[in-house]
């Protein structure tokens, strides 16, 4: 199991959304805007059939939502925040990698979104990928957490636009597949 830019301890932006949007007078407008953003990003990524439910996503991505998920599925959880967890539990290997950086490519329209979410979120000064704090991205054995990519770059979304001066996201996935092959998995 590999967590890539995972919200393993929640997202500071989601926490901000829970505190300032959900249940408030802007909930409907915010939900419509976030659903539209999700629909556009899905379409640009070639997945227009995916449905968006922004409010449920915000709740799930919040610290409280992530904690509930982690309590149900704790294998690989780091022993300390920003630490490593077990990389083998019950025959399952646990790894993670993550990134930092909000502005990564001048042609990437998601950069503006991540500058905003980074500014609004509760991150306590921690570096982020625009949506998730660096240490929240760790799970199991952390391979790397300092790639200069935003949250979408890490999964090579939006036409594969990512930082031209950084490791290509596809290279990270290939290297990880090679790691598994070399382990006989």
Map each language-model feature to its residues.
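Helical cap/lid subdomain of alpha/beta-hydrolase-fold lipid enzymes
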Residues: 2-185
């Amino acid at each position: 199991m590999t967590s890539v830019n995972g919200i393993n301890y929640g997202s500071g932006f989601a926490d901000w959304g829970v505190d300032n949007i959900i249940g408030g007078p802007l909930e409907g407008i915010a939900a419509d805007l976030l659903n539209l953003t999700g629909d556009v990003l899905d379409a640009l990524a070639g997945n227009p059939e995916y449905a968006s439910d922004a409010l449920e996503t915000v709740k799930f991505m919040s610290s409280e939502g992530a904690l509930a998920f982690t309590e149900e599925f704790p294998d690989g959880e780091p022993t300390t925040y920003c630490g490593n967890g077990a990389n083998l539990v019950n025959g399952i290997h646990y790894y993670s990698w993550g990134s930092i950086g909000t502005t990564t490519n001048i042609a990437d329209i998601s950069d503006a979104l991540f500058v905003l979410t980074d500014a609004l979120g509760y991150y306590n000064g921690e570096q982020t990928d625009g949506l998730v704090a660096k240490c929240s991205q760790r799970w199991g054995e952390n391979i790397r957490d300092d790639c200069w990519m935003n949250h979408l770059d890490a999964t090579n979304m939006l036409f594969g636009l990512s930082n031209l001066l950084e490791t290509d996201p596809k290279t990270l996935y290939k290297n990880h597949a090679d790691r598994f092959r070399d382990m006989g998995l």
